[in-house]
């Protein structure tokens, strides 16, 4: 979605969203950035960044809280790609961990693997209130904590449960595997090579042009500055300070893993960035009575919305809230940073506003063979030709419906709407096309007396051929053939 084509009402909607959160005293201040693969498109802010009344801007640093986990995951995958570790390695290969107990289990559970911790399926309890106060824990104290062992909620690798402790363990794995501290490795291997020069784990080292925001928490009817934790053994769960512009640049780079051959492979391969954005542990959620598919990737949440797959992560920390979200198919995304504790920042809601305003393109670029097949189908509608059918159809088509019956159906449908040679060659964009894959297409066929919907799916065997074709009255469902029905 080119930024130049973004409707003005998209920015108006987001301005209203963040302004309403400040006016309702949900947060003292907020800033957002809308971005595409080409960089920021527009931004806005509301409220204050600190007690001096200054307004936050896209170059003001906030704590991004658990959005930091995407950096932790990327660091692990970078070490994996270098051959230093495997996601199948037990965490105990790198960390001295005491006994792990699963109450009620008949045998001692196995130690979680690195991959299980990345996907939030390490069997550790959800621990937000406790873990958010542990960032400054020393490495010595963390070593002692690990040696005491852990009580598990499930066998590692069997189900989703969000655990900050799991990502603190990954921070230690990075330290042991790389020979550098977690913060040094992320800074030297991810932040600096990507030009994220204003980001830091320590507010005192953050060089954001717009300064560093003061974090607040609510006490009665007043905002009070929140205590600031310093870097330590739990920095890998949520310790980064970033500007909205730099977090948007990070998200844009992650999303750019989708066009094969994307830039930045020297920092982390595009295939590994795509791996972060795949669903590795299912966690269906119920929203307004409806179950929505989703779960956890590696350091990122992955959910299926009505607009398609959305990748995101929310962050909540004493004094700060954050959310980043993007739509991989269009690489259009939103970052929102706020300076209030656990404010449930609404970046996914903002992204839906932007997608609705921009209009969604076809989900995937069609194969040339799919576009050519549409022309051949309309050629058959205008005048049946067995030679055209022979080169168009895969070998299953005549087995699924004998040729004479298929011909009769197509000829009858064409006569019903008055389709002829003069009706062909309408631009595809004017035919209400929809697609869920490069290999399928549904579009409207318009004749002299009416319209119908046509849906085709192609095989992957070269040369791709049509394996199913469905003609239906406009407004009826063509979906069954695309899902495997006949």
State where each predicted segment sits.
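Catalytic loop of the DD-peptidase/beta-lactamase superfamily, centered on the K-T-G motif
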Residues: 1-45, 175, 180, 184-188, ...
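Active/ligand-binding-proximal structured segments within catalytic/core domains
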Residues: 72
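Short solvent-exposed beta->alpha transition segments
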Residues: 387-435
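Cytochrome P450
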Residues: 158-162
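Short, conserved catalytic-motif segment at the N-terminal edge
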Residues: 7-64, 84, 100-104, 139, ...
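A generic structural signal for nonpolar/aromatic side chains embedded in well-ordered alpha-helices
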Residues: 117-118, 145-149, 276, 354
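Active-site helix/loop module of the DD-peptidase/beta-lactamase fold
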Residues: 13-15, 29, 54, 58, ...
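Short, solvent-exposed secondary-structure junction/capping segments
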Residues: 43, 76, 91, 96-99, ...
């Amino acid at each position: 979605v080119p930024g130049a084509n973004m409707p003005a009402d998209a920015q108006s909607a987001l301005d209203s969203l963040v302004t309403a959160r400040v006016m309702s005293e949900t947060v003292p201040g907020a800033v957002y950035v809308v971005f595409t693969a080409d960089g920021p498109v527009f931004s806005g802010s509301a409220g204050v960044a600190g007690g001096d009344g200054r307004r936050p801007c896209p170059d003001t640093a906030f704590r991004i809280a658990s959005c930091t986990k995407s950096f932790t995951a990327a660091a692990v995958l970078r070490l994996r790609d270098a051959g230093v570790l495997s996601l199948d390695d037990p965490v105990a290969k790198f960390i001295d961990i005491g006994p792990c107990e699963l109450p009620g289990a008949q045998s001692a559970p196995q130690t979680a693997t690195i991959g299980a911790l990345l996907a939030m399926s390490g069997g550790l309890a959800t621990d937000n209130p406790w873990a958010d106060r542990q960032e400054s824990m020393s490495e010595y104290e963390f070593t002692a904590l690990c040696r005491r062992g852990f009580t598990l909620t499930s066998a590692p690798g069997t189900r989703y449960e969000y655990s900050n402790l799991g990502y603190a363990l990954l921070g230690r794995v990075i330290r042991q595997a790389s020979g550098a501290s977690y913060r040094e490795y992320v800074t030297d291997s991810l932040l600096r090579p990507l030009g994220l020069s204003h980001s830091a784990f320590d507010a005192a080292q953050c060089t954001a042009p717009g300064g560093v925001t003061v974090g607040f928490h609510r006490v009665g009817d007043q905002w009070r500055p929140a205590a600031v934790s310093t870097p330590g053994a739990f920095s890998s769960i949520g310790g980064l300070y970033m500007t909205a512009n730099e977090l948007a640049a990070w998200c844009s780079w992650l999303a750019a893993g989708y066009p094969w051959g994307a830039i930045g492979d020297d920092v982390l391969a595009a295939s590994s960035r795509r791996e972060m954005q795949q669903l590795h542990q299912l966690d269906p959620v119920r929203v307004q009575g409806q179950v929505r598919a989703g779960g956890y990737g590696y350091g990122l949440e992955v959910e299926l919305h009505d607009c398609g797959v959305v990748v995101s992560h929310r962050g909540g920390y004493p004094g700060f809230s954050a959310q980043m979200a993007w739509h991989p198919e269009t690489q259009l995304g939103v970052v929102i940073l706020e300076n209030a504790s656990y404010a449930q920042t609404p970046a996914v809601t903002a992204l839906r506003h932007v997608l609705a305003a921009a209009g969604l393109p076809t989900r995937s670029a069609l194969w040339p063979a799919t576009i050519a097949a549409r022309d051949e189908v309309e050629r058959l509608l205008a005048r049946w030709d067995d030679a055209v059918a022979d080169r168009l159809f895969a070998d299953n088509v005549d087995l699924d419906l004998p040729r004479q019956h298929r011909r009769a159906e197509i000829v009858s449908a064409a006569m019903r709407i008055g389709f002829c040679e003069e009706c062909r060659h309408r631009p595809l964009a004017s035919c209400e096309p929809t697609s869920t894959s490069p290999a399928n297409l549904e579009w409207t066929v318009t004749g002299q007396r009416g319209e119908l919907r046509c849906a085709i799916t192609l095989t992957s065997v070269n040369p791709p051929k049509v394996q199913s074709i469905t003609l239906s009255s406009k407004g009826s469902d063509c979906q069954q053939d695309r899902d495997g029905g006949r």
